[in-house]
Amino acid sequence: MKKYSEAIKIAFAYVGVVVGAGFSTGQEVLQFFSQFGIYSYIGVVISGLILTFIGRQVAKIGTAFDAENHESTLEYLFGKKLGLVIDYVLILSLYAVTITMIAGAGSTFNESFGVPTWLGALIMCIIVYITLLMDFNKIVRALGVVTPVLIVLVILIAAASLFQGSIPFSKINSVVEKPNLGIAIWNGFNYGGLAFAVGFSTLVAIGGDASKRLVSGLGGLIGGVVYLVLLGLINFALHSEYTEIKDAAIPTLVLAGKISPILTFVLSIVMLAVMYNTILGLSYSFAARFTSPYTKRYYLMISIIVPLAYALSFVGFEGLIAVVYPMMGVIGLFIVVAVVVKYFYRKSQDKKFIA
């Protein structure tokens, strides 16, 4: 029973990180999936399968190496020299996602509560900085605690959309602008790469903290399945009111508003919480890559990177997403391919599995 409890904790932490950059606002799902109609569900399945299988493998690798950061995992996948190159590209890209999420938090505070964007982003940075002063187990608990709430809200919104939505499933392709199978399939891979790249470093570290490979692998597997279900549900909900949400900055708030003003308020809080999850997880991974956690250098590092990310977030949420997200998708897919190749290579050689 204890191993299942630990696996579920890992799964919720995993989902909590990738959801922040993945679909907390709904805008990401709209751009990558919903606008391509019914075909988008093929992309959703592809993305979910990437997160499920690859997440399981990477969590097990993290446990095998007792990893505190992703360096040893990348060296295992790519070799020392190429692994180092991928390491620096990934960690700098993850920092760019951190900046993007801080900008998104500022925008969410502004649109939901009328708080100035600069102040909303500052509040988020202060909360993240304080949490980073705690040990990693506390961070895992912080990451996981909001995920069940998000799951309930997404299911509630999707269920309401099933009965109240103005667009039936059979009519979706007639209202979307770009019902395209090819692009939907590519976006499934690209989005899966994006979500995996965002969660990679944190999942390796969480796997390194797990007691056994079986537990960490199960946690990654459960996390991927939960992510697949959530992604499919939110895509369905967006389709059910597509004509109303297609031009919205934060589509999920529009959907919540059609159900209840109270739900809109609660969802706003949860959206900020999952953004916090992502910023927190990525900031820790960045600091842990260059320092030993909870040393003087670590505290100095977080005292630099958090204020710097806040300053750079003034570039703007939409502008950052347009540049950072496609790039992260490609980087993530590169690592995904390496994990798959390594898996089948070791299987063909009949070697003892690290993952």
Give the ranges of each region predicted by the language model.
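Juxtamembrane transmembrane-helix boundary signature
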Residues: 45-71, 233-237, 241
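Membrane-interface interhelical connector segments
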Residues: 177, 238-261
